[in-house]
Design a protein with these regions (language model features):
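Conserved HGGG/HGGXW glycine-rich cap/lid loop of the alpha/beta-hydrolase fold
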Residues: 18-63
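Conserved loop-alpha-helix segment in the C-terminal half of the alpha/beta-hydrolase fold
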Residues: 224-263
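Conserved alpha/beta-hydrolase catalytic His-Asp/Glu region
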Residues: 157-224
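A short loop-to-beta-strand scaffold at the N-terminal edge of the catalytic core in hydrolase folds
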Residues: 2-4, 8-18
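Active-site loop/oxyanion-hole signature of alpha/beta-hydrolase fold enzymes
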Residues: 55-95, 99, 125
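Catalytic histidine-centered segment of alpha/beta-hydrolase-like enzymes
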Residues: 263-276
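Flexible "cap/lid" loop of the alpha/beta hydrolase fold
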Residues: 115-152
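Short glycine-enriched nucleophile-adjacent loop
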Residues: 101-112, 118
Length: 293
């Protein structure tokens, strides 16, 4: 299945996979250089007997060709609204990973009931370089402009997403077991980073230009304002700086939390059984009839 979405005069065609029957569940992968809707397939398979699921690629990401655009948080905020207003109206639940979780949380902070149940998997609000360096730096913008340029841009990008770099990134931040990213799975990830036009959204994510928020305080405030039940899931092996943000979110009253004994930023992909065991009881609960906060 392909979704069509118009953004600033350009029609974008985005990959989407549907499966199962029952209450509607929208699954949104992380925003990252190697992410696509396929990372949600293990959860889709486990949800299919009880739910009608749809997993969707983000604009600028996935394994298809992508146009050159100056991607911004406004685009992703608008895309979430498009999905919930025109594609999966009034879903029973939304399962979202990484930055996707925070974009959904941002949307729900101002939503009116009825609201879906929110499953936030290893949620992040700050890109890799700002996380590593403790904030934004002037050279981030220069790097984006450089990667956008023909000729040198693709060269710089390829040097940073070659096979060795992707495996190193996976072992360092994404997967608990370095051997998990091998064989067909590695080929799928390489297809994502090598898709025509992949560099434009990727470099903006890495440099923090797709960050939906500017501070932890705003991140936590969204959770307090969300008029929806929230379940937070993350792995104990999540990199410390990202884990600190998740632990702060876990301390917000009303946020239910499951910390899995294993797993990093893609815990749902690597440990789908444990993730599903955490999600299943939450999805079967009766939803409140009115906003709770």
């Amino acid at each position: 299945r392909t979704l069509e979405w118009n953004w600033r005069g350009e029609t974008l065609r985005l990959g989407a996979d549907a499966s199962g029957s029952g209450p509607k569940v929208l699954l949104l992968p992380a925003l990252s250089s190697i992410s696509s809707r396929r990372e949600m397939h293990p959860l889709q398979e486990r949800l299919a007997p009880r739910c009608s699921t749809l997993a969707v690629d983000w604009p600028g990401f996935g394994d298809a060709a992508r146009p050159q655009m100056d991607w911004t948080p406004d685009a992703y905020t608008a895309f979430v609204a498009f999905l919930l207003n025109s594609v999966v109206e009034q879903p029973h639940a939304i399962i979202a990973a990484g930055h996707a979780a925070t974009y959904v949380l941002k949307h729900m902070a101002d939503a009116s009931p009825p609201t879906p149940q929110l499953v936030l998997i290893a949620p992040t609000w700050r890109g890799p370089l700002p996380t590593m360096l403790g904030g934004h730096r002037p050279f981030f913008d220069r790097l984006c402009r450089l990667v956008d340029r023909p000729g040198i841009g693709p060269l710089i990008y390829r040097l940073n997403v070659n096979r060795l770099a992707v495996r190193y990134m996976g072992a360092g931040h994404v997967y608990a077991d370095p051997a998990f990213l091998a064989g067909e799975r590695l080929r799928e990830k390489l297809a994502v980073v090598r898709a025509p036009g992949a560099r434009f959204a990727s470099v903006r994510f890495v440099t923090g230009r797709l960050d939906p928020l500017a501070s932890r305080a705003t991140f936590l405030d969204l959770a307090r304002r969300a008029a929806a039940p929230v379940l937070l899931i993350y792995g104990a092996e999540t990199p410390p700086k990202s884990r600190a943000e998740m632990e702060a979110l876990a301390a917000v009253p009303g946020v239910r939390t499951v910390r899995l004994p294993k797993g990093k930023l893609s815990v749902h992909e690597e440990f789908p059984d444990a993730t599903m065991q955490a999600i299943a009881p939450f999805l079967t609960e009766e939803k409140p009839s009115a906003a709770t906060g």
